[in-house]
């Protein structure tokens, strides 16, 4: 099913801790056409550089061989492998379709989530390994930072609450969607650090910034902290007030 194809792709990205994974055009031809079309149009599959090696089909030995490409004067391109195992085989042509690759990584997944939920994707840098900020998500009661966790499997994280990304994915009108209602519930139900713990985090960040950039103003320090997940949506003036306490 289309959902199964997306879950398979997300599982591979999670297994590589968010790093880029590639899928060949040959493999994609075995996936549901609707899934492949949606994955490409929604930015979850992006063009990758052509494969540098292939399994040679010149004989039954199925050797993995490097691909050589020649561009002729008229602009036409020919790719092939050179067999060094058999005396009766030399160049084995490789169709361009066999070399085509598509890629997906955690950043592409974050972009898909932001677009699906109508979020402005944040420029906040990760403050924790394996936890990527996506954007400020609104519930019915509060607004909090939505993040993507990439440890082993992909999960949406709000505050201390987490949910596997695969559990909130569906397909509608030929495109992949996220369950907005469930996400709103996550935002409203998320428990964040208590007030004193939050203030302590700001004070620690303030001291670290002062040590790194000693000649900046307190306003500048508070503005930098406001761009990080530990701000929890608070503005710079609120942070400044409590980081100096």
What name fits each language-model region?
Residues 1-204:
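Low-complexity, PEST-like segments
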């Amino acid at each position: 099913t289309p959902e199964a194809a997306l879950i398979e792709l997300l599982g591979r990205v999670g297994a590589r801790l968010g790093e880029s994974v590639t899928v060949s055009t040959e493999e994609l031809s075995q996936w549901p056409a609707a899934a492949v079309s949606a994955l490409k149009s929604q930015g979850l599959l992006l063009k990758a550089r052509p494969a540098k090696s292939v399994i040679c089909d010149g004989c039954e030995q199925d050797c993995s061989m490097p691909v050589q490409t020649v561009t002729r004067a008229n602009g036409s391109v020919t790719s092939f492998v050179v067999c060094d195992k058999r005396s009766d085989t030399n160049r084995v042509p490789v169709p361009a379709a066999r070399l085509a690759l598509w890629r997906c990584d955690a950043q592409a997944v974050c972009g898909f989530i932001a677009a699906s939920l109508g979020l402005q994707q944040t420029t906040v840098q990760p403050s924790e390994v394996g936890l990527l900020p996506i954007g400020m998500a609104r519930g019915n009661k509060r607004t909090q930072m939505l993040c993507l966790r990439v440890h082993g499997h992909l999960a949406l994280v709000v505050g201390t609450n987490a949910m596997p990304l695969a559990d909130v994915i569906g397909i509608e009108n030929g495109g992949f969607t996220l369950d907005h209602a469930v996400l709103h519930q996550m935002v409203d139900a998320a428990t964040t650090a208590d007030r004193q713990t939050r203030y302590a985090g700001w004070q620690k960040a303030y001291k670290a910034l002062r040590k790194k950039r000693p000649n900046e103003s307190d306003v500048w320090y508070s503005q930098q902290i406001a761009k990080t997940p530990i701000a929890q949506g608070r503005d710079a003036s609120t942070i400044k007030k409590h980081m100096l306490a």
